[in-house]
Amino acid sequence: MSIRERLGFANPHLLTASTAAVNALGGKDTFLAVHVRLSDGPFRALREQTVRSVWYRLVACAMRGVNASAGSADIYELERLLVPTNAVLPPPRVPLVQSVPLAALRPPEASMAGERRIKCAGKQHVAPELVPLNVPLFVATDVEDGLALAPLRAAFPCTILLRDLSDVPEIRTLERLVSAEDGVPLGPFLAPLLDAAIMGRAWAVVGTEGSTFSTYVEGLLWRLEHGHQIAQRG
């Protein structure tokens, strides 16, 4: 086993909490996941472009699960419908499905089932062409304000952040952990790891270009969780 293949999570507290969170979302491979980094440096300057880029890639994943031929033109029309403030913009030049193996481009088997323990805040789509977007979307982000994430919520009515899972008992337990050495609360340090562990068990995952966290989740953790080969670098 290579060093990269050993970079998954083994901490029992983290595994217990992430498994409970995944189950609350409906189970492994029943939800999409995205990492949206927006708050600092170049990411702050490019926040609108970043949200639009991941929006296109997420919608492509959801739509191609039921229609493999869905392309940029189809998704652009959906954007004009769901995010009218972007209607004057040309389609972004981004790969629609990047770093997601073709095997992942299938409908999640239980995404609409009643197994989810978390309540979706948005109103579910009823139009047939939009129903695939009812799939739960887990969002890991450093900016949780409604305006920044509004395009995602408009497309995915079941958009869920880590804070929305705070009632899951195992997550509350993780948040209460303290260091045995100095009594420092560990919750804030474990939250990004919990985000990553949840994302790794999504049906498909999309990240922010240039983010090392996104690269780790997309290129290593998600692939480990799904039994795909990990590309060796350097």
Walk through the language-model features, giving the residues of each:
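A donor-sugar binding/catalytic signature common to diverse glycosyltransferases
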Residues: L190-G234
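Core catalytic architecture of nucleotide-activated donor-dependent transferases building glycoconjugates
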Residues: M1-R176, A180
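Long, positively charged, glycine-interspersed low-complexity recognition regions
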Residues: R153, S166-F189, L193-E209
